[in-house]
Every structure is written in C-alpha cells, then in structure tokens.
UniProtKB/Swiss-Prot annotation:
The gene is rpsI. The keyword Ribosomal protein applies. Keywords: Ribonucleoprotein, Ribosomal protein. Residues 98-130 are annotated as: Disordered. This is Small ribosomal subunit protein uS9. NCBIfam families: PRK00132.1. It comes from Macrococcus caseolyticus (strain JCSC5402). SUPFAM superfamilies: Ribosomal protein S5 domain 2-like. Residues 111-130 have a biased composition (Basic residues). The lineage of its organism: Bacteria, Bacillati, Bacillota, Bacilli, Bacillales. One of its GO terms (biological process) is translation. GO terms for cellular component: cytosolic small ribosomal subunit. The keyword Cell wall biogenesis/degradation does not apply. It holds the Pfam family Ribosomal_S9. InterPro entries: Ribosomal_Su5_D2-typ_SF (IPR020568), Ribosomal_uS9 (IPR000754), Ribosomal_uS9_bac/plastid (IPR023035), Ribosomal_uS9_CS (IPR020574), Ribsml_uS5_D2-typ_fold_subgr (IPR014721).
C-alpha cells in the first residue's frame, strides 16, 4: 500500500521549492542533503520550521524538498511557503492559524530590473558639474 504523502509548492524571489510531507519523526532533507548541511545559518532553519511551530506539528512529518533557483534566504522562505501549503493539504483546519501568521501568502517582492541609461535599477551615473 502506498504511504500517505502531502505535496506543496512554495515560491519566493527566483526560488521554487517542491515539498513532500510524509508522516515520520521530523527529518528534513533538502536536495538529498540534511537541512543542517544545506542551510549554514540557524536563522534560516528556524525560518523554515515556523509552519510546524504555528500548527504544533513539529516532529510529526518527514520533509523531502527539491529546491532550485535564487539564494539561500529565498530558498528557505520558498521551502517555508511549500511546507505551509502541504500542511494545509494534510489538515484544512490549519488554514486560520497559517493565514494569520502570513505563511500562505506568496511574497510578491522581486528584484527590480536594471533600466537603460542607469547603472542599476535606480542608481544613476555619477554626475560631473564641470
């Protein structure tokens, strides 16, 4: 018999995380590596564990993640978004608490594009008076 599996996709900046929750003892695997090997900062690990703290399900699920694109912070927040969506699929009762904490909202902020005639998105070339 196939085991129960809950899936969620999270996005943040240019990162996309495909998350699978399997009932287990709380192991988190990101791209085939342990979470402590993949994310070097404790703050990022705490960040992606927030949905479990809010729903009080820490240690109930093993998390398998495939994430690509962006940097470490964007990836951690994409994983958090994916975990929240997967938890919602596991139990719709969590919607209220996750929504209040802002875990289900896709953060729309992206890098602003470089404009022609400027050095960056907003920085203009150095001005010379003479």
């Amino acid at each position: 018999m196939a085991q129960v599996e809950y899936k969620g996709t999270g996005r943040r900046k240019h990162s996309v995380a495909r998350v699978r929750l399997i009932p287990g003892e709380g192991n988190i695997t990101i791209n085939g590596r342990d979470v402590r090997d993949y994310l070097p900062f404790e703050s990022l690990i705490l960040d992606l564990n927030q949905p479990f703290d809010i729903t009080e399900t820490k240690g109930n699920y093993d998390v398998l993640v495939n994430v690509n694109g962006g940097g470490l912070t964007g990836q951690a927040q994409a994983i958090r978004h994916g975990i929240s969506r997967a938890l919602l699929e596991a139990d719709p009762e969590y919607r209220g608490s996750l929504k209040r904490a802002g875990m289900l909202t896709r953060d729309p902020r992206m890098k602003e594009r470089k404009k022609p005639g400027l050095k960056g998105a907003r920085r203009s070339p150095q001005f010379s008076k003479r």
